[in-house]
Curated annotation (Swiss-Prot):
The name this protein goes by in its record: Apolipoprotein N-acyltransferase
Organism: Escherichia coli (strain K12)
Record note on quaternary structure: Monomer.
Residues forming the catalytic site: 267, 335, 387
Main location: membrane
Length: 512
């Protein structure tokens, strides 16, 4: 009785919500304790039972603050190291970001308790998953979006991974919310029926992991080399270090020419404008073509627009075997989804003068097109994404083509030091390979550089914070997964059906 009385106190529930939210961080890399996702979501649902809408919204907010406060604390590393502001201000900015993201979980909990106040199957198994899908969409879309820490990613090595090639990671989010709600209902009501249904729903997708949605093409196996330069972020954009940086990458690449069909340098490996490096690029292109290798590299490009101003792009270009390199070549990729404050500054004229954090090097990029043709290097077709873009499953899928041989992502996670951020980023990249059934080549400045197999498995990787080259044979695949064909449309149809049913049944219950 004492415990039952204690748990009814709103302050206790708020504290528990904070703890259950923080527990959710353990579901993601580098911890990879996937059951923590279920425990965390169970806590969110159970704590909002028998609460008024505003109380539930507060619980949802605290739960989100626990999740994001612990799960994205790596943002502090970047702000504290490169922001040039006092410590308390750095902490405040991280708290502000976590609080903003928590508004969406608060919205979920508040609306759920407002429209479906009773602790029923309808609430936990039908309404909650549909509403969660909507609020998670909003979190990934409003103000350019920040869809980090979606619990579906926790299943990259878990029992539900087989659902990803069929309906994508968001379908796993949907199912996790449903299963967690049923488990919470079984626990609170002490009823075995929701428990049985939850176990069945959780077990049903397990055999799907054994379906192979792709066909390997061993005759097209190539040797790939990815150069991890490990250039400190504090030196990366120092003009005095440019020549040394080029030497590091060239010296690591020269022995690979003629041996590796494809050589990859990371995001902005060449820390200068492409137009300024024409002699270097053309000489390197000629050497690569003479030896039958191709190079893909990140670089910065600036182009004069119709308003007679320069648009600066975070770009990938190709050199080597095939058509000679040209500054006018269309075989390039310009990053579309830019990171606020890192690659562009909202309200630029107001914020830039305020602090160094708002005036970081290379923080005035322009957007490339949303849909871009694949890169072609040495006859290899690559669907590309730069850094943050790889977490955007629908965008990667929209750029994916049936003839894509590999997914390619280049990144620079040096901003986030030895935090958990790069591991979370890596986990999300693995999900893209699983969803689209293609090997993924991930080249980074200081880790995590790796080759991911078409089932999301790690085939090869090198340690973080080392200056090394990852060289391995990679076999391309062919074939289209159901998710590659349809994207998130089936899930949105399911969400609409669940939402309609939940509203209709709720109205009927109120009329009785």
């Amino acid at each position: 009785m004492a415990f039952a009385s204690l748990i009814e106190r709103q302050r206790i529930r708020l504290l528990l919500a904070l703890l259950f939210g923080a527990c959710g961080t353990l579901a993601f890399s580098p911890y990879d304790v996937w059951p923590a996702a279920i425990i965390s979501l169970m806590g969110l649902q159970a704590l909002t039972f028998n609460r008024r809408p505003l109380q539930s919204a507060a619980i949802g907010f605290c739960w989100g603050f626990g999740l994001f406060g612990s799960g994205i604390n790596w943002v502090y590393v970047s702000i504290a190291t490169f922001g040039g502001m006092p410590g308390p201000v750095n902490i405040f900015l991280v708290v502000l970001l976590a609080a903003y993201l928590s508004l969406y979980t608060g919205l979920f909990a508040g609306v759920l308790s407002r429209l479906w106040p009773k602790t029923t199957w309808l609430r936990v198994a039908i309404a909650a998953p549909a509403l969660w899908q909507v609020t998670e969409f909003l979190r990934g879309w409003v103000l350019t979006g920040f869809p980090w820490l979606q619990f579906g990613y926790s299943q990259i090595d878990g029992p539900l991974k087989g659902l990803a090639p069929i309906m994508g990671v968001e379908a796993i989010n949907f199912l996790l919310m449903m299963v967690s709600g049923l488990l919470a209902l079984a626990l609170v009501k002490r009823n075995w029926r929701p428990l049985v249904v939850a176990v069945v729903l959780f077990a049903l997708p397990f055999p799907l992991r054994y379906i192979q949605w792709f066909t390997p093409q061993p005759e097209k196996t190539i040797q790939v080399s990815m150069v991890q330069g490990d250039i400190p972020q504090s030196l990366k954009w120092d003009e005095g270090q440019l020549l040394n940086t080029l030497k590091i990458y060239y010296n690591a690449t020269a022995p690979l020419m003629g041996k590796s069909s494809l050589i990859i340098w990371p995001e902005s490996a060449i820390t200068d404008l492409e137009i300024n490096q024409q002699p270097f690029l053309k000489a390197l292109d000629g050497e690569l073509r003479d030896k039958g290798s191709s190079l893909v590299t990140g670089i910065v490009d600036a182009r004069l627009n119709k308003q007679n101003r320069y648009d600066t792009y975070n770009t990938i270009i190709t050199l080597g075997k095939g058509a000679p390199y040209s500054y006018e070549s269309a075989d390039r990729y310009n990053k579309n989804h830019l990171v606020p404050f890192g690659e562009f500054v909202p309200l630029e004229s107001i914020l830039r003068p305020l602090a160094p954090f708002f005036d970081l090097p290379m923080s005035s990029f322009s957007r490339g097109p949303y849909i871009q043709p694949p890169l072609s290097a040495n006859g290899i077709e690559l669907t590309a994404a730069i850094c943050y873009e790889i977490i955007l499953g629908e965008q990667v899928r929209d750029n994916f083509r049936p003839d894509t041989d590999y997914l390619l992502t280049i990144s620079n996670d040096a901003w986030f030091g030895k935090s958990i951020g790069p591991w979370q980023h890596f986990q999300m990249a693995r999900m893209r390979a699983l969803e689209l059934a293609r090997p993924l080549l991930r080249s980074t400045n200081n880790g995590i550089t790796a080759v991911i197999g078409p089932q999301g498995e790690i085939q090869a990787m090198i340690p973080q914070f080392t200056r090394e080259v990852l060289t391995t044979n990679v076999t391309p695949t062919t074939g289209l997964t159901p998710y590659a064909r349809t994207g998130n449309w089936p899930l949105w149809v399911l969400t609409a059906l669940f939402g309609f049913a939940a509203v209709l049944m709720s109205l009927r219950q109120r009329r009785k």
